[in-house]
Each structure stands twice: as C-alpha cells, then as structure tokens.
Amino acid sequence: MSKQFGKVGVLYGGRSAEREVSLMSGKGVHEALLSAGVDAHLFDTGERSLADLAAAGFERVFIALHGRYGEDGTLQGALELLGIPYTGSGPLASSLSMDKIMTKRVWLQHGLPTPAFEVLGGSTELRLVPDRLGLPLILKPPHEGSTVGITKVAGYSDMKAAYELAARFDAEVLAEQFITGRELTVAVLGSGAAARALPVIEIVAPGGNYDYEHKYFSDDTQYFCPADLPADVAADVAAVAERAYAALGCEGWGRVDFILDRENRPWLLEMNTSPGMTGHSLVPMAARAVGMSYADLCVAILAEAACKVRSPARQD
C-alpha cells in the first residue's frame, strides 16, 4: 500500500471556522491510513505555508479540511499549480459547492428541487422577506458549513438578529424557505458515470435542532442508516443525490443534504465536497452500512486522488 500511494499528506486544521472539526477529521484519516500501511503524514495548512507543502515531497494528498481555504477551491487551485494529486472535487466544483447561493442556482438550472430563497444584503428590507418566503425561514451565511451562523427565524422580530449573525461571516446572507420534514443525507463515492450513492441516512436531533454541538459532540442525536423509507422513495432520494453531485461537477466523494417533506418529496439543501470524517460523521456511517470499514473508506477516497485540470497542449 505504501508503494502504491507513495508519501501521502493529510491536509487538516486550516484557518476556517471549522478548524476544530478538521483537526478531528484529519487525525482520524491519518490513523486509518497508517493502519492500512500508507506512508501518511499530517500537514496543518493553518500553521504551515504552501512553500512547505511544495517542499514536503508528497506524491498525493488527502484533503481533510472543511470550510474556507480548504473546501472552496482555493487550495485545490494551488494543488493544481503544484501538480500534486488530491482527493475530492476540483477547483470549480469545490467553489460552486461551497457557495450555497451558486449551488442552488446550478441545481435549479438542472431542474433539481431546492427550497425557494433570496439573497440578502445591507439594503434589504428584512421585514418584507418573511412575506415572500413565509415563516419560519432559515438565514445562513453562504460560505460556511457545519451549521455555523445559521438561524431558524420564527417571527418578524427575529430577522434582524439572525441577519446580523450570518452577516458576521459573509457580505451576503441566504434566506431560505423552511421545509417541514425529515432530515436526510446521502454520501456519494466516485466520479463521472461511476459515481454511486451510499445508503440514505436519516438524522433525528433532540427538538429537531441539528446544530454544531449535535453534529460533532452530542450522543443524543439519532442516526438511522439505512433510513426507514419505502424502497421507491429511498431510490428517488439516491438518484437525486447523484444528479445533484453530477450537476456541480463533483468528483471523488461528497455528501448531499436533504429535507424530505410530508409528501415524500426530496428537497436539496447543500453539497459538501469535503465532509466530516470524525467519530460522529455521516459518510463513514453510510460506508459501514455497505460493509466498508473506516480505513477502507479512506483508502478508497485516496485511490481517487488526481489533478483535475487538464494542461493545454503546448504550442511551440
């Protein structure tokens, strides 16, 4: 295994609001790769430079970063320039998927279902937004993950505080129609025609509040994998996940988040191109449901590592 992959860097930590989660993901991936015989080394991009990365002699890297500067296409572009194969999606798909506004626009262009939304700025009359989207609604920063900066707005009086919280992270704020239903997520492995959805997971958090604490630290959240769904509904959700993944040009692996409404219609919420790999994370859970261990999953993701941008032919 060591010879197959050579010297591997596990990129983790970083400088985003999700640094602590990334530290947990990276350590887990590193230990799993070592157990599989891979010559793996941790590399904290929040503490070391691109020059250090270029000099490290990695033959490929596993990106275990979440959020800005790790999941948004910037690092992927740098790795393309350095010629270092990496896991996950390329610069464009990563950038599109990290921007929740652009993600929804792409999905709508492909005829995929996603809740109605508006983009809010400093000049938006906040009191009018609930009249258009209804209440409750969701306000969130477009470029953060792990539920950072998200508020469920129950009434008109909550709009200002919710907007100000989200605006701490982004110049624009995404207001989204709230869909009542079951929270689902689907992991997808592979690229192109070979990309396949893993079993659907249902998430049931206490009080319906699946926030940062419940995602990564709470043992109170319940997960059902595979989700208790009629076979045709599960197949439909998986198919929509694969289409959503393909529409954004995703590669390698990812996770698609949904709400399933009371009529069993799936609504797309977000695309994650570098999902969590912690003890509470969902992609490893889905992999276990098909007999794939955590280490097997890490090796499978690493095996897909590649540079995605084709160099143009030289004109001499």
Curated annotation (Swiss-Prot):
Cofactor: Mg(2+); Mn(2+)
Pathway(s) of this molecule: Cell wall biogenesis; peptidoglycan biosynthesis
Subcellular location: Cytoplasm
Residue positions binding Mg(2+) 2: E270, N272
Classification via SUPFAM superfamilies: Glutathione synthetase ATP-binding domain-like, PreATP-grasp domain
Residues that hold Mg(2+) 1 according to the record: D257, E270
Reactions listed under catalytic activity: 2 D-alanine + ATP = D-alanyl-D-alanine + ADP + phosphate + H(+)
GO biological process: cell wall organization; peptidoglycan biosynthetic process; regulation of cell shape
GO cellular component: cytosol
Name this protein carries in UniProt: D-alanine--D-alanine ligase
